[in-house]
From Swiss-Prot:
Reactions it catalyzes: 1-(2-carboxyphenylamino)-1-deoxy-D-ribulose 5-phosphate + H(+) = (1S,2R)-1-C-(indol-3-yl)glycerol 3-phosphate + CO2 + H2O
Pathway annotation from the record: Amino-acid biosynthesis; L-tryptophan biosynthesis; L-tryptophan from chorismate: step 4/5
Similarity remark: Belongs to the TrpC family.
One GO biological process term: L-tryptophan biosynthetic process
Protein name in the entry: Indole-3-glycerol phosphate synthase
Superkingdom classification of source: Bacteria
Species annotation: Campylobacter fetus subsp. fetus (strain 82-40)
InterPro entries with a match to the protein in the record: Aldolase_TIM, Indole-3-glycerol_P_synth, Indole-3-glycerol_P_synth_dom, Indole-3-GlycerolPSynthase_CS, RibuloseP-bd_barrel
GO molecular function: indole-3-glycerol-phosphate synthase activity; phosphoribosylanthranilate isomerase activity
Length: 258
């Protein structure tokens, strides 16, 4: 299973990182870090297509997606096109990501940043805060509900928002147990990488009002976004489609219907 494999490798890598910089030293360094920006405000704008645009070099299923990968150049195009937030992959082995991409983009742009990774430890949340992320991804499928709540509350204590990703009703139960306020519905099954494009239609009616809902994966045109917005989605996480376009700026504008 792909998800299990990635998480196993993440845990091993994390132990090595912790040896060089223990959590107590990492937390002490947070006093000099950026102040997180208001993510919820930008994701729930009613009169716009709110896009979380991904900065992603590779994936386990597709390999290298963008050969000429320049995270800052991509971020500039996204920002010029008016995206609501960036999603920056930081997982190094399967997605060829890096925390340094967050630090770089944070330094030169004003758009909120999601650390997209396979977070299994509070250490990674402290890292996200130190490098300049404004919110983090937690994958409900990867962890039990009690540990999810521990991670969620730690993130909140650092003033980071959390995008809680779900794929089925069991995941949704975990998200509601945690009282997540931003819930992402991933059309892609992270165990098999199969897609279910009807998932938002099935799950959105089960989510209490007042939650911010993000539709994720497999979105390619403006009409899909408009339809999902009518169903109750507030924002859309889009990555691979933009990475494959010659003009990222034009691709975002097309997606937004502008």
């Amino acid at each position: 299973m792909i998800l299990d494999e990635i998480i196993s490798k993440t845990k091993i890598n994390l132990e090595n990182i912790k040896e060089n910089l223990p959590l107590c030293r990492l937390e002490n360094a947070l006093t000099n870090s950026y102040i997180p920006r208001d993510v919820k405000q930008v994701l729930k704008q009613k009169n716009s297509i709110n896009i979380i645009a991904e900065i992603k070099k590779a994936s386990p299923s597709k390999g290298v997606i963008k050969e000429d990968f320049d995270p800052l150049k991509i971020a500039f195009e996204y920002e010029k096109a008016g995206v609501s937030a960036f999603s920056i992959l930081t997982e190094p082995f399967y997605f060829q990501g890096s925390l340094e991409y967050i630090a770089l983009v944070r330094r030169y742009t004003n758009t909120p940043i999601l650390r997209k990774d396979f977070i299994v430890d509070i250490y990674q949340i402290a890292e996200a805060r130190l490098y300049g992320a404004d919110f983090i991804l937690l994958i409900a499928k990867a962890l039990d509900k009690f540990y999810l709540k521990t991670l969620f509350e730690y993130a909140k204590s650092l003033n980071l928002e959390v995008l809680m990703e779900i794929h089925d009703e069991t995941d949704l139960e975990k998200a509601l147990f945690v009282d997540a306020d931003i819930i992402g519905i991933n059309h892609r099954n992270l165990q098999t990488f199969d897609m279910d494009m009807e998932l938002c239609i099935k799950l959105i009616p089960l989510i209490p009002s007042g939650k911010i809902i993000v539709a994720e994966s497999g979105l390619y045109n403006n009409s899909e976004l408009i339809n999902l917005k009518k169903q109750g989605a507030d924002a859309f996480l889009i990555g691979e489609h933009f990475m494959r376009q010659e003009s990222i700026y034009n691709a975002v504008k097309d997606m937004k219907g502008e």
